Design a protein with these regions (language model features):
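Flexible, gly/ser-rich surface segments that form the specificity/activation loops bordering the active-site cleft
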Residues: 122, 141-196, 205, 226-235, ...
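Conserved active-site neighborhood of the chymotrypsin/trypsin-like protease fold
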Residues: 88-173, 203-204, 357
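N-terminal activation segment of mature serine protease catalytic domains
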Residues: 27-86, 92-98, 104, 128, ...
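C-terminal cap/linker of serine protease catalytic domains
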Residues: 36, 40-49, 220-279, 320, ...
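C-terminal motif of bacterial Sec signal peptides marking the signal peptidase cleavage site
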Residues: 18-20
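PDZ domains, with a preference for the canonical peptide-binding region formed by the helix
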Residues: 98-101, 298, 309-348, 454-484
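PDZ/PDZ-like domain segments forming the peptide/carboxylate-binding groove
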Residues: 75, 203-213, 265-309, 313-316, ...
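Active-site region of chymotrypsin-like
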Residues: 55-60, 135-148, 173-236, 280-288, ...
Length: 485
């Protein structure tokens, strides 16, 4: 500390000696130059600060998730905070993670002086995107002096981007990052993969942890979906996905990203390739499943077909193709990243050793037998005589914990893995989830996770048919419940 002080005094003394040696004009010029340089830095800093503060909106959400074991109840409320990107029309773009299962959402300006309640305009759990807008309140006052961001174009590997953050006190933080790779990533709803930039940058810890905007050349490039502080890797939802999402909301009726509706496996194994009659110059994906009423089924695709081309893009043995801009990408981007519902694509397949062309019109998948994403939806259940009946969902199975695929009941897991074996005469799977201890249920307390086939002789397709069946007891007034084997 003393050394630093002495050195500072020595510097000041030296500066005084040199300054006394210059003439009046040169001293004035140096002072003027110094003043201009300092003013330029201040102006630039003010400009950057203004851009961040004027285009970012704080988002505060209260989240409550429905209980799987007690479907009439909710978990304790949790708070989430994030930064959203202000768009044209006083709308705010954020991730679905900030809006899913939210009981209350509010918008707050950068300096914490104005707050307004918000509502969800559109949400896509699969792509992890949500669009918010004010819900009553003084809209004009809230958005006064704020400037919307324009959507930017796609980037390439090596491009530099800025990650915008705000401290609690409103001070902006701008982190420089470099795009290192592009991949297809699932960021929120499991099993749904979308185009994602992976950038390298050391982000500072700030109050907004769930998502922040990423900027390139003054325009919105994407939204942060995750950050690995150890490896300093930032996952960014790509602009193509955001643009498709925004375009779909323009008519007020959000549809969502299309699906082909198939299950696939790779064709790497040489013995498997010989059996499929695949030559060495062909890649290909083996079709293992065709979803009921899907675009693939309507187009005539069959289980056992091998997809070797999609819209003239050769599909490799592991499912990758060469994208003109990004290089090697997984085949799903050809469906969910560059096309919309109603678009037609051409599939070149190998069936029995012969190549065929199939045209498929993309659609949204129908509600599956076992619903995978039940965000913002209360569990469908019925309590009758102390017996709790539910419709099976992936949410229920995941409630068994981190290792749910090993801990959940095997009979219910089998339904999720092979729903086609259970679809006959069913819209949903109804099962007995638990028994409430009462005098009437004595001896039945351990009954749980049994699939319901019939009640009072009526086949059970969903909860609504279960309710109808219980209205028709036997002549003795008793109800008969038949479980699946």
């Amino acid at each position: 500390m003393n050394t630093k002080y002495i050195f500072s005094v020595f510097q000041l003394s030296l500066l005084f000696v040199f300054s006394s040696c210059c003439d009046k004009n040169s001293c004035q010029n140096e002072k003027k130059s110094s003043k201009l340089t300092q003013q330029s830095i201040i102006d630039a800093a003010s400009s950057d600060t203004s851009a961040v503060r004027q285009s970012l909106v704080r988002i505060n959400s209260t989240i409550q998730i429905w209980s799987a074991s007690q479907p009439w109840d909710k978990s304790a409320p949790k708070k989430r905070r994030a930064l959203g990107a202000l768009l044209e029309g006083n709308r705010v773009l954020t991730t679905a993670e900030m809006a899913a299962d939210a009981t209350y959402i509010e918008l707050e300006n950068a300096d914490n002086t104005r707050i307004i309640p918000a509502k969800v305009v559109a949400i896509d759990y699969e792509a992890n995107l949500a669009l918010l807008e004010p819900d009553n309140g003084d809209t004009d006052s809230f958005f006064k002096d704020l400037k919307p961001l324009r959507l930017g174009s796609s980037a390439k590997i090596g491009d530099r981007v800025d990650v915008w953050q705000l401290e609690d006190n409103g001070m902006p933080i701008v982190t420089d990052a470099v795009i290192q790779s592009v991949d297809i990533v699932s960021s929120f709803a499991n099993g749904h993969f979308f185009l994602t930039y992976e950038a390298k940058g050391s982000m500072q810890s700030a109050s907004n942890s769930f998502t922040v905007p990423v900027i390139r050349n003054g325009k919105l490039l994407g939204l942060l979906s995750s950050y690995d502080s150890k490896d300093q890797i930032i996952d960014i939802i790509a602009p193509e996905i955001i643009q498709a999402f925004i375009a779909d909301t323009s008519d007020g009726d959000y549809v969502g990203f299309p699906s082909l509706g198939i299950g696939i496996s790779s064709t790497v194994d040489p013995n498997f390739r010989d059996w499929l009659k695949l030559s060495d110059d062909l890649g290909g994906l083996y079709v293992t499943k065709i979803r009921k009423d899907s675009a693939a089924q309507k187009a005539g695709l069959e289980k056992g077909d091998v997809i070797i081309n999609i819209n003239d893009k050769a599909i490799g043995r592991r499912g990758y193709y060469t994208d003109q801009q990004y290089g090697r990408l997984y085949w799903s981007h050809l469906i969910r990243g560059s096309l919309k519902q109603g678009d037609t694509l051409e599939l070149t397949i190998l069936r029995g050793g012969e190549q065929k062309q199939i045209m498929a019109t993309l659609t949204r998948p129908e509600e599956p037998l076992v619903a995978r994403d039940t965000y913002d939806q209360a569990p469908v259940y019925l309590i009758k005589g102390g017996l709790i009946f539910q419709e099976l969902t992936a949410t229920y199975l995941k409630a068994f914990g981190k290792d749910w695929q090993a801990k959940a009941p095997l009979n219910l897991l089998d339904i999720m893995m092979t729903p086609e074996d259970y679809e006959k005469d069913r819209n949903k799977i109804v099962f007995l989830s638990a028994v409430i201890p009462t005098p009437a249920t004595t001896g039945y307390e351990r009954l749980r996770n049994f699939i319901i086939n019939k009640v009072n002789g009526q086949t059970i397709a969903d909860i609504s048919t279960l309710i109808d069946a219980f209205k028709k007891p036997g002549t003795d007034g008793l109800h008969t419940i038949e479980f699946a084997e």
